[in-house]
Structure formats: C-alpha cells, structure tokens
C-alpha cells in the first residue's frame, strides 16, 4: 500500500483544520486564522522560487498580523533567508501516519469513549483547560467534510477530548487534550481507539496527526501505537515591531 505523500498530508491538514480565509498573492499564501492558532495563521511559500520577503512583511504589517511563516520540507531556501533576517524557530512539529486498521482495536471498553457532534459543554471545558478556546471551536465548525468530536473517560469522569475529520482516504486527528490529573491513565489511548473506529467506519485507510517535537509524552504514545513519523515542519517568527 502506497502511503500518502507529504503534499497529500498537507492538503488533508488544510481541509480538516481550515483557516477562515486564504489567498495567494506575489508568491505567498496568506491566511486569516481568526485566532485559531499558528497553523491557520502562518504564511507559506506558494511557489518554488523564493518570493519577496520585504513585500510579505509589509503586507502582514498592513493586515495587523504576526510575521509568522510555516517552513515545510522543501522550504530550505526560505528558512535560511528568514534566519538571516532574525526570525527564530518556534514549535517544530512532527507528522505521524498509520494504517487505520492497525490502530482499530477488536473492541472498545464499554462506556469509556464516544464520538459526539456537536461538542458538549464539558468537552469545551476540557479543551479550554488546555488552551483550546472558542476560535478553535469555531474552526472545527468550519470543516465541511465528515467530522466528529471525541470524548474519553477515566472511570466515570470525562477526562480527554479530540477532534477528527475526514479528507478522502485520510482521517486527521486534531486538538487532543487530556486533563493533567488524568494523564498516564490510558485516556489518550481510549481517544485513539475511538478515533480509529470512527475513521475506519467512514472509509479512511489512514489516520494522521501532528504534535510538537517537544511533547515527549505524545511522541512516545504515537510511536508505541505503531504510528510512523512521515514529515515535519516548523515556524519562524519575528516581532513585527
């Protein structure tokens, strides 16, 4: 089975975690993230050759946006140019991928995980505790493909949440959050199992997700489940002042 390419995963990410608006101009793709975080707010290069950095800096300043760039595989020239202009690396990210069938368990623990749309109030509270607030909930509502929110319990207590959406053969998992007092109790594994069941039931051959390189616990979990790192990206940022 041929795995999706890095470009295909980027398409799936855009579909399942969309900016409010995007447009291309002067060799750049410019996003309005509406407060939804770096991934939907960062500028990316939209051509092979290096575009005019001074132009995009001036444009971002006019728009009142951060000078924030996403650097993907193949963007090495842009990365070096931004470094020379004083932009610092922030939040290196690893992309993980796995065949859905490999993640789906034979059965799920009874009454320990659920697929729910729209998110319940308690789910919003768990997300908020992890810094995922209303702009990102609004982002989830913007997704136009099949989607669901995930809830997992620890015993009888709601303890973890996630968001899953489909783009063709790929189900992308986003916004995984487990309350600190319930970590290392298997809650994230329950979320992953429920996500895999939903994904396979909806025809997804693959499940993908991303996490920061510094999130040791998440990287350990995804590797232990048989997910493979298949790509990476990072951001470069500079105070527009």
Language model region names:
Residues 138-179:
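A conserved beta-strand-loop-helix scaffold within acyl/acetyltransferase catalytic domains
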Residues 50-57, 178, 184-197, 201, ...:
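Conserved acetyl-CoA-binding loop-helix of GNAT-fold acetyltransferases
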Residues 83-90, 223-232:
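Conserved acetyl-CoA-binding loop of GNAT-fold acetyltransferases
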Residues 70-77, 209-219, 236-240:
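Conserved beta-strand-loop-alpha-helix junction that forms the acyl-donor binding cleft
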Residues 36-43, 90, 165-174, 183:
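A conserved beta-turn-beta hairpin within the catalytic core of GNAT-like acetyltransferases
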Residues 63-73, 199-210:
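Conserved GNAT acetyl-CoA-binding A-motif
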Residues 1-62:
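N-terminal charged segments
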Residues 1-12, 42-46, 93, 101-136:
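Short amphipathic alpha-helix that is part of the acyltransferase structural core
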């Amino acid at each position: 089975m041929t795995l999706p390419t890095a470009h295909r995963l980027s398409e799936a990410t855009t579909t399942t975690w969309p900016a409010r608006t995007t447009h291309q101009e002067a060799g750049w793709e410019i996003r309005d993230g509406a407060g939804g975080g770096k991934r939907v707010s960062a500028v990316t290069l939209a051509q092979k050759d290096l575009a005019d950095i001074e132009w995009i800096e001036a444009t971002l300043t006019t728009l009142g946006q951060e000078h924030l760039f996403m650097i993907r595989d193949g963007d090495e020239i842009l990365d070096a140019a931004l470094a020379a202009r004083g932009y610092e690396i922030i939040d290196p990210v690893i992309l993980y991928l796995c065949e859905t069938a490999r993640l789906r368990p034979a059965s799920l623990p009874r009454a320990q995980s659920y697929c729910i749309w729209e998110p319940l109030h308690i789910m919003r509270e768990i997300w908020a505790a992890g810094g995922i607030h209303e702009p990102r909930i609004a982002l989830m509502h913007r997704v136009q493909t099949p989607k669901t929110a995930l809830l997992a319990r620890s015993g009888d207590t709601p303890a973890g949440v996630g968001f899953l959406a489909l783009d063709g053969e790929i189900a992308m998992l986003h916004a995984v959050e487990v309350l600190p007092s319930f970590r290392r109790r298997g809650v994230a594994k329950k979320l992953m199992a429920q996500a895999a069941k939903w994904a396979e039931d909806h025809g997804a051959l693959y499940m993908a997700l991303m996490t920061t390189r510094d999130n040791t616990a998440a990287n350990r979990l995804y590797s232990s489940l048989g997910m493979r790192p298949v790509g990476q990206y990072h951001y470069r940022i500079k105070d527009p002042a």
